[in-house]
């Protein structure tokens, strides 16, 4: 299952962060972002579809 933030939508051709992967990890475009602090839920980075800044509405591992 994939999440893209509070809006809950999935960007075309890109899955931004998936449950079970490290925080801030992008799947689909083949690039990983920087890791966000555990429990804080903030991620920055790039993926194959361009730069993004992403917020997690809940804490993952």
Curated annotation (Swiss-Prot):
Keywords: Keratin, Repeat. Expression restricted exclusively to the cortical cells of hair follicles. This is Keratin-associated protein 8-1. GO terms for cellular component: cytosol; intermediate filament. Belongs to the KRTAP type 8 family. The keyword Transit peptide does not apply. Residues 13-49 are annotated as: 11 X 2 AA repeats of G-[YCGS]. InterPro entries: KRTAP8-1, KRTAP_type8/19/20/21/22. Interacts with hair keratins. In the hair cortex, hair keratin intermediate filaments are embedded in an interfilamentous matrix, consisting of hair keratin-associated proteins (KRTAP), which are essential for the formation of a rigid and resistant hair shaft through their extensive disulfide bond cross-linking with abundant cysteine residues of hair keratins. The matrix proteins include the high-sulfur and high-glycine-tyrosine keratins.
């Amino acid at each position: 299952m994939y999440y893209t933030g509070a809006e809950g939508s999935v960007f075309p051709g890109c899955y931004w962060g998936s449950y079970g992967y490290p925080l801030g990890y992008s799947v689909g475009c083949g690039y990983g972002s920087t890791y966000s602090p555990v429990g804080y839920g903030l991620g920055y980075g790039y993926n194959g579809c361009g730069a993004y800044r992403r917020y997690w509405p809940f804490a993952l591992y």
